[in-house]
Amino acid sequence: MLLSDDPAAQELHLLLEKAIDAADSGLTSIQFADLIGLEREVTGYTYYTVPVAVHASLRYRNSFEDAMVQVVQCGGDTDTVAAIVGGILGAAVGPNGLPRHWVAGLCEWPRNQAYIKGLAETLVRSLDSSEPLPHRSPVFFKLLTRNIFFLLIVLAHCFRRLLPPY
């Protein structure tokens, strides 16, 4: 737990203030990362990941795509930073604020956009209900088939790495 007199809390608070100031002044996320000493990449250290994510979320609050591109261009632990930014801005802009060309490319058979939308609607309805609401789940066999297929691809890559040239 971070307490106000804890030096770690003070460090995080200072970095978050810098993130807010940098976003207000128009610095890009890459420039902000450089400013806090992350010239080469954003590490997975929480005190760097969170301020960069907060900066991108504030600086690019009107453009989900620009925010995501900026944090990925920062380098390093981009999946974590992008997940945080995506969660913050995705909640703010909703499905209509996501880039259409990105959404159109989403495909994780057997879970598709219709499944995700239905699940979201069930979750919203469950907020008004004291009873758990059923949701349609992808068929277990379909998920198992898909996962075995990808496991075989991963294993093939692993075994290929055992063969020359190393």
Model-based region annotation:
Residues 8-23, 29-40, 88-93, 103-109, ...:
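Short, Lys/Arg-enriched charge-dense amphipathic segments
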Residues 48-134:
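Catalytic phosphate/nucleotide-handling subdomain of diverse soluble enzymes
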Residues 1-8, 101-114, 134-146:
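A broadly tuned preference for mixed-charge, low-complexity surface segments
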Residues 1-75:
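Accessory "access/gating" subregions that flank catalytic or transport cores
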Residues 126-166:
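C-terminal domain-closing interface element
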